[in-house]
Amino acid sequence: MTQTVNEREDPLNLGGGGWASSIPLRTWSSYHRRQRGAPVSKRRYRDGPKIEYEASRKQPKQQRSPGSWFQPSRGPYWALYSNWERCGGPWRPPLIAFQSPLCPAQMIRAYGLHPLCVCCCSCWSGPWNPGWERPPGRKKRWGRRGRGLRRHPRRSFPRNPPIDLSKMLRPVNLSGWRAPGMRAPRNTTQFIMNQVYEDMRQQEKLERQQAALRAQQAQEGGISPGDSTTNDAPHSGVEEDSQLPEDLYGFMQDPSLTFSPALMQHNQSPTPGLVEEEEKNVDDDECDVEVCDEKEESEEEEEEEVDRGSEDEDVDEEEVEAAGNGEEGEEDQEEEYMLEETGLEEGEQRAEEKFLPLGMPLSILVGDEEERENFMNYDYLSQEQIIPNVPEADLFMVPDISH
């Protein structure tokens, strides 16, 4: 043997498998070969292929035969002196003719009497059948204590550690331990929301710094801080910023408000530089709206010219058709003009909606509180409008969509 099996005792294989190796050699007696039908050196799968070994022949097990007249079967050494018959009958005292005077050990075995103690104690209760008794060092396999003893008498500590029940209802860690960068936090949604809020706080902080910087620049420009209506400049800057989108929205809804003096008084800010910036922004927005309107009108005029050209080409075909179709054609043209006008209005509305600032409150689009209440309560609709009285025959009519 060149390899040690017990790697824990000889991890570097220093023993070399000789007489001084870490494995004690098996005894070379014939008993071990007969015992379980195994060869002398039982080869494992890790010992390598068979080279000089012979194929291990299976030896028949020694069967325990019942006692016969010429060779009674021998019981185990710990059940030698018993009166339990070999064939398995109940216990009865042996015949007096065959009895020899019992030595103290046989008396203890047979009657459970202690030679030194003639009292009623635990040493009296010996098992009648020694087959019920276990050989020393063997485990108790049945009884009222369940399968096996709870604590082995030779073992001072339990084999399995006690289970910590506090960890039983914890969520299962499916991913196991990973590197810190690879592991997602326990509540990923909460983590993402925290990041979002942190970004919002940083943005607010940046806006405050910018407002303070603007106020400082305005003060350096020669405007005394006493002119400002609010207590401190940074807060006034923030208020102006929040007020700006509403004013812009008002200007775009009604351009005549741009030049009204009342609005200018109402909208007057502590820094005229900011007022000029607002006016510039408003003018730019109006210019953009006008330019967009002009572009849309020019595109629509080109489309109308193309339509008219195609209409002129189609005139000859229409003359060939029946005279009754002329009235329908005029109605179609009127409908087209109406659609074009509505398209123009929608285009203007879209152009206005395009320039809505992102910070605009959505309550403007809903309307006043009274309208909102009516809208929610459906008070402006009568009961017949909500649930129209339709005859039942019409409910089961299937509209014909083939034409």
From Swiss-Prot:
Low complexity composition bias: residue spans = 209-220
Q: Where is the composition biased (Basic and acidic residues)?
A: 1-11
Where does the record place it? Nucleus
For bias kind Basic residues, which ranges apply?
137-157
The annotated consequence of gene deletion is: Knockout male mice are infertile and have malformed spermatids, though testicular size and body/testicular weight ratio are comparable to those of their wild-type littermates. TNP1, TPN2, PRM1 and PRM2 expression is down-regulated in testes of knockout mice.
Listed InterPro entries: CCER1, Coiled-coil_domain
Descriptive protein name: Coiled-coil domain-containing glutamate-rich protein 1
Q: What species is given as this protein's source?
A: Mus musculus
The lineage, from the top, is: Eukaryota, Metazoa, Chordata, Craniata, Vertebrata
